[in-house]
Amino acid sequence: AREGGFIDDPDDRGGATKFGVTIHTMRNLGLDLDRDGDVDVADVRLLTRAQATNIFMKHYFKQPHIDHLPAALQPVVFDMYVNAGSNDVKILQSVLREFGAIITVDGCLGPQSFEAAKIVQEKAKDFLVDAYAIARRNYYFNLADRRVASRKFARNRAGGKGGWIHRAEEFMQEKYRMTDAEFQMRVSKWA
């Protein structure tokens, strides 16, 4: 429900996208919806919300095993997987390590990550979700620091928080969200 309709923003590395499903994903899945022998922008335009939902459930939730994580973590990790692929798992694994878990940061969810997430969740409670959401926000800032074209996703045209930052902060408690002044200070070097 979060993802919007068709967009083909040249600054978005995902390329043509509809309901959050990128042309790259559709090509990987062989979704030639117009049956013309290739997967192109026309196929992206034909994607239905129901098809997108099925893709997300199968390939973004079940296949990477996000459904095996503690229930409190599933929404934020799933949302980030839709937005950033396996980088979301690396962020999670790094956060778990910050809580003392001894796991490999490899971008793959497996028994070590599941057990570490369960143990840390039991100890840290809601703070694990907050810590993950903060790390996610920092990931977006770091992307925008390195790639000027990505800044419009972190900062809107009026200079306030952009979609990426709002998206990350939706999953954290209010006390961990940046104030407008903190946000302005963080992005001030972007000019």
Where are these regions (language model features)?
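Cell-wall polysaccharide-cleaving catalytic domain and substrate-binding groove, primarily
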Residues: A1-A191
